[in-house]
Amino acid sequence: ESLHYLDVSMFNHILSSRVKFMGHISTVEVRYAETDQMGIAHHSNYAVWFEVARTDFIKAARISYTDVEKEGNITPLTSLECKYKKAAFYEDQLQIHASLTKLSPVRLEFSYKVTRDGDLIATGKTTHGMVTKDLKPINVKKEHPEIYRMFENALD
């Protein structure tokens, strides 16, 4: 019985180290403060929700922003795009689907889908540069290959 447990445990460890991470879904509830006078979620909140989903994605992919920053690197936002399809309202439960869709040694691109009960509300993208804390571009693949591999394993 314990031998079987060890076999399964070892199999799960091997499997988890080889299985590609495929995105993450975060849930947010539209708060009253996030709505306008008409009760519709204000457009500026989507950027915040994208960040929530992106940081949840990074944690779920077992990438540590803290470790990346300890190495002296940061990933500032360089562009943000959002296409609104339908309105979101106060108390809506929104699912933010985040995935890493592009990776280069100096840049990351995340894509987002915002849904409510499976209905598409918005789509978006954010692009992030890879720079030192002094804001100098860095080739992470060359200078920190272990960090690059973590992002590569999370690539959709």
Task: Describe each region flagged by the PLM.
Residues 3-6:
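Short hydrophobic targeting helices and cationic amphipathic motifs
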